[in-house]
A protein has these predicted regions:
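Non-catalytic terminal and boundary segments that flank Rossmann-like NAD(P)-dependent oxidoreductase
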Residues: 1, 41, 98, 247-270
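Aromatic pocket-lining residues of Rossmann-like dinucleotide-binding sites
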Residues: 15, 166, 221
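Conserved mid-core alpha-helix of short-chain dehydrogenase/reductase
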Residues: 57-60, 102-117, 213, 220, ...
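C-terminal helical subdomain
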Residues: 109, 172, 176, 194-229, ...
Length: 270
């Protein structure tokens, strides 16, 4: 099987374990830092540099990958997310709109550009699979996730809209996987991410899904075993997305439901 990847370490490793031949892609800056090259050497694959917001770059990724792999691509993974507003610690009611544009372009519109580029080039084989990684904040409010929640909501919408078109014309599946919180570069700037990680792990009946388990699920979505699954957002979070309030959380918060205030005595909502 031939697979094209946009930066997802564990999934790349798992795909190669299953016999896939892949290419990797990341920003030129990330490649210069050496980590992607190290993964490529480990997996015996090539890296194609690209700015995910550039249609020209994305078209080059697909063209080059088809040359390297010797034909159309079977599976594609979109695993990209970044918010300048989160990095600059701007709250949702004080966003910089230029930064918001960048958040949406990098984290969601890049998904549309990627699929559109692939479709115009006929780069993905019939009955192929496209997957993007999302998060429950696209559908539920998580204070601190900020404009990344808007980006993930857009990401999921793109999967539905493009999934219909690509499915009708080429039987290509397009889905998003809403993964448990994981410690990533994109999530590192989210306030309280470590506490959210612990909270969701305790709330979920099965606990958080790990990065390795996410990779396993992605492989299933790439496979022919899910040939009729498309236009879906699939929760892979140990059940967290369906839990209202666990008994443990209820007992804990019953002991400490005082209003949360800042150093000036102002109530902090969230």
């Amino acid at each position: 099987r031939r697979v094209l990847f946009r930066s997802a370490w564990k999934v790349a490793e798992r795909a190669v374990e299953e016999g896939a031949t892949i290419t990797l892609s990341n920003t030129p800056m990330a490649i210069r830092m050496g980590e992607v090259d190290a993964l490529a050497q480990k997996l015996n694959c090539q890296v194609v540099p690209a700015d995910a917001t550039s249609v020209e770059d994305l078209e080059n990724v697909f063209k080059t990958s088809m040359d390297i792999l010797g034909g159309q691509i079977d599976f594609v993974l979109h695993s990209i997310g970044m918010s300048p507003n989160v990095r600059k610690k701007r709250t949702y009611d004080d966003l910089d709109y230029g930064m918001l544009d960048k958040t949406l372009d990098i984290s969601a519109v890049s998904f549309h550009k990627m699929i559109q580029s692939a479709k115009k080039l006929n780069a993905i084989a019939d009955y192929g699979s496209i997957v993007a990684l999302s998060y429950v904040a696209a559908q539920r409010t998580f204070y601190g996730y900020n404009d990344m929640a808007d980006a993930k909501a857009l990401l999921e919408s793109i999967a539905r809209s493009f999934g219909y078109i690509y499915g009708r014309e080429h039987s290509v599946r397009v889905n998003t996987i809403s993964q448990s919180p994981t410690f990533t570069t994109a999530g590192s700037g989210v306030k309280g991410m470590d506490k959210l990680f612990d909270f969701s792990n305790r709330m979920s009946p099965l606990g958080n899904a790990t990065a390795d388990e996410c990779a396993d699920y992605c492989i299933v979505m790439f496979s022919d075993l899910t040939r009729k699954v498309t236009m879906q957002n699939l929760f892979h979070d140990g059940g967290f997305s369906s839990v209202g309030m666990s008994l443990r959380a209820m007992a804990t918060y019953e002991k400490g439901l005082d209003e949360y205030m800042d150093e000036n005595g102002n109530i902090i909502y969230g």
